[in-house]
Amino acid sequence: MSRSLSSNGRVRRRKRILKLAKGFRGRCGTNYKAAKDAVSKALAHSYVARRDRKGSMRRLWISRINASVRTQGLSYSRFMNGLLQAGIALNRKVLSNMAIEDPGAFQTVIDASKKALGGGAC
C-alpha cells in the first residue's frame, strides 16, 4: 500500500487562505499562520456586517420617506398608518425610491394616505 502524503492538499489550503488575505497589512498578508487568523476574523466581521446592513438600509429608507412626507404636513407614522388604512401595500424601499425618483407618483400616494386618515391634518 502506498503512503499518502498531504502536500498537495496542504499547498492548496495555504494558497486559498493567502489568496483571501491578499491586501491585508503587514504579516497578515504573507504569513500563513497570521493570515489564517486574520481571514477568520474578517469573514466573521463580514457575516455580521451583512446582517447590520439590512437594518441600516431600513433606517435610511425611513429617513427619506419621513423627510418627503413632512414637506406635505404629515409625520412618518401617520403616513404609514394612512397607507395601511387605504390598503396600499408598498414597502419602505419602494416608497423611498419613489420619493426620490418619481415625486409625482409619491404625491399621489401621500394624497391617498391623507384621504384614508380623513382630511390629512397632522
UniProtKB/Swiss-Prot annotation:
Q: A single GO molecular function, which one?
A: rRNA binding
One cellular-component annotation, GO: ribonucleoprotein complex
The opening ranks of the lineage are: Bacteria, Pseudomonadati, Spirochaetota, Spirochaetia, Spirochaetales
Protein's GO biological process: ribosomal large subunit assembly; translation
Superkingdom is Bacteria
What job does the chain carry out?
Binds directly to 23S ribosomal RNA and is necessary for the in vitro assembly process of the 50S ribosomal subunit. It is not involved in the protein synthesizing functions of that subunit.
Q: Which gene encodes it?
A: rplT
Entry similarity comment = Belongs to the bacterial ribosomal protein bL20 family.
Entry keyword set: Ribonucleoprotein, Ribosomal protein, RNA-binding, rRNA-binding
CDD domains, sorted: Ribosomal_L20
What's the protein name? Large ribosomal subunit protein bL20
